[in-house]
Amino acid sequence: MLKPYATKLENIKSEITQIGVDVVDAMELSLRALEDKKIDSLKNIEITEKKLQVKSNEIDNMILTTLALYSPEAKDLRQLVSYLKITNELVRTGSNAKDFAKKFKKSYSDDLNTSMILEYAIPLLRSALLSLQTSISILDETNAQHIEEKYHRVIVEESKTDDLYLMIEKNILKLISKNLDLSKEYFDILSSLRRLEKC
């Protein structure tokens, strides 16, 4: 592999990792806010879809330039195409993380059954965060067996988030049936948690 090409690949990987770190940081702040029951601190999540999209476009341009200049072979071509997909997914995840923080903060109130909500929201967020961290760590992995193990770990965590969301959805629907006056607030909480489940 040509040295300039290898350098370009490392730069692209580094930029993608930085987007991932920004999204992970936002999710960690959200987790800390929920664990400490300081929901107002969710407003401190400073990740924006616009900034992520700009960064993603820069990475996409780097990838396209690399494709044009170096005409990579099949394996390297697949790697570059996967980088395009990864940046797109990280932007989507970052957007969902920001939407979660914004919607959860807006709809969370002491009128709701906060202990039940947090009982499921915290593990849901923790599982989504672990899945994202593991996914990002795969970028630097070169051992095929370790990649496979991490991939399976991601699948397990995503399955956990699905299960936790279904459990909280069922419990919130029960709460709504008992207290129709708060149905909008509960649905808003559910909507915010749905964003988290999609991270």
Residues covered by each model-derived region:
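Cytosolic, long alpha-helical scaffolding segments
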Residues: M1-C199
